[in-house]
Structures are given as structure tokens and as C-alpha cells.
Design a protein with these regions (language model features):
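N-terminal leader/targeting segments and the immediate start of mature chains
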Residues: 2-76, 202
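A short, amphipathic edge element
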Residues: 130-142
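Beta-turn initiation residues at beta-strand->coil junctions
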Residues: 57-59, 84-87, 105-108, 156, ...
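Gly/Pro-enriched, hydrophobic low-complexity segments
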Residues: 143-202
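An acidic-aromatic
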Residues: 71-126
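Short, solvent-exposed coil/turn segments at beta-strand boundaries
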Residues: 47-52, 72-80, 96-101, 147, ...
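Amphipathic hydrophobic-ligand
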Residues: 64-70, 91-97, 161-162, 188-191
């Protein structure tokens, strides 16, 4: 009798432990993109209120390739900051956009310049927030998907022949961007952005 009681108790304990483990896994998955459909993930990206990123940018011109490492911080309508980490000769340069004025500063060079009423504040094609705005306003924006990622595409309405199409890749499981390609009018990738670190809606 005691053996049966102990066996029943052991089975109940194992079921409880199994239930707790399953519950924790389901909570973890619900916090990421595991239970989200494609449109929910796209809506999540399009409605970001803030983010911080560390990105590697490769820019291909007609003559050469240049590589930069940047930090970006987007605070909605308040302030956007972009800081150069590499190359070392321009490291420390910060571009701060408050929505009206553009401030360029570099403590190493004792540089502090403010450009008031800057017309092209929204034209930083390296910025995720610029992609989001372009995607929202362009009726040709669309997406593709596969098992691991969602690929968002939009056309850039610009006279700049080197920036005509933007393609953003989103990891399904984390709901975070992994890379972005910016193509010219001949479909050549001119700018390739790799998202090394991403914090969203801090």
C-alpha cells in the first residue's frame, strides 16, 4: 500500500515538474516571435517606439568599398543619435537629430556644430527608422517569408540613383532585424548593414 502511495506521489510530482517546464517554455516562446504570425511581426517592427543598435556598414561605390561600425539610438520623436565607432580616424563623431536641428559633435576634435531647420533630417538611409517610414508610405512595400525570416522590401522615392530599394531581414524567433540591403537603380547592393546588437523598445 505504501509503495503504491509513493509511486502515485512520484507520478504526481513528475507531472507537476513537467507542467512547470512546459509552462516556462511556452512563456519564453510567447515573449519572442515563436507564436507570432508574419503580419504581427511586421506590425511590431513598424511600430517601434525606441531602439539601440550596433551595426557594421559596408558601402560600395564605383571605385572602392568602405566599412564602418556605428552605434544608433532612436528615441521616437525626441532624439536620434548616430555615433561612429570605426574607423579610428573618425571615431567619436556623433550626429544628433532632434527632429528640427542637426547637431554634429566630436569631443576628440573639439567639434560642435548645429545646423538649424535642416531639411533632410529624414534622409539617413542607414537608419532603421528611415526604412520604417519608407515602408509605411510606399504602396509598393511588400514582404516575403521563409521558415526562419521575414524579408520586408520597399522602394525609395528619391533622386539618388544609389538608393532605390531597401530590403530588411527580420529573424522570426527574436523579431529583430539581422541585416539590411540598399540597392541602386540597377539592383546592385550599394549598402549592406549587419545588425550586430539590437535592443528594442527599451
Amino acid at each position: 500500500m505504501k509503495k503504491k502511495y509513493r509511486l502515485m506521489l512520484l507520478i504526481i510530482i513528475l507531472l507537476i515538474i513537467g507542467g512547470i517546464i512546459f509552462y516556462k517554455k511556452s512563456i519564453k516562446n510567447s515573449k519572442t516571435g515563436e507564436n507570432k504570425n508574419s503580419q504581427e511581426i511586421i506590425d511590431y517592427i513598424l511600430n517601434l517606439s525606441s531602439y539601440k543598435t550596433k551595426i557594421t556598414v559596408n558601402i560600395t561605390s564605383n571605385k572602392n568599398n568602405n566599412k564602418y561600425i556605428l552605434k544608433q539610438e532612436f528615441k521616437g520623436n525626441k532624439e536620434n543619435i548616430q555615433e561612429v565607432i570605426e574607423p579610428s580616424n573618425i571615431a567619436g563623431i556623433k550626429i544628433i537629430n532632434d527632429g528640427t536641428n542637426l547637431k554634429i559633435e566630436n569631443s576628440n576634435l573639439n567639434l560642435n556644430t548645429i545646423i538649424e531647420n535642416y531639411t533632410y533630417l529624414g534622409n539617413n538611409c542607414l537608419d532603421l527608422s528611415t526604412f520604417i517610414e519608407n515602408y509605411k508610405v510606399n504602396n509598393k512595400s511588400n514582404y516575403e517569408e521563409n521558415e526562419n525570416e521575414i524579408i520586408m522590401k520597399t522602394i525609395v522615392e528619391s533622386d539618388n540613383i544609389y538608393v532605390k530599394e531597401e530590403i530588411l531581414y527580420i529573424d522570426r524567433s527574436t523579431m529583430k532585424p539581422t541585416k539590411m540591403e540598399i540597392k541602386d537603380d540597377k539592383q546592385k547592393t550599394r549598402i549592406y548593414i549587419l545588425y550586430n546588437e539590437v535592443e528594442i523598445n527599451m
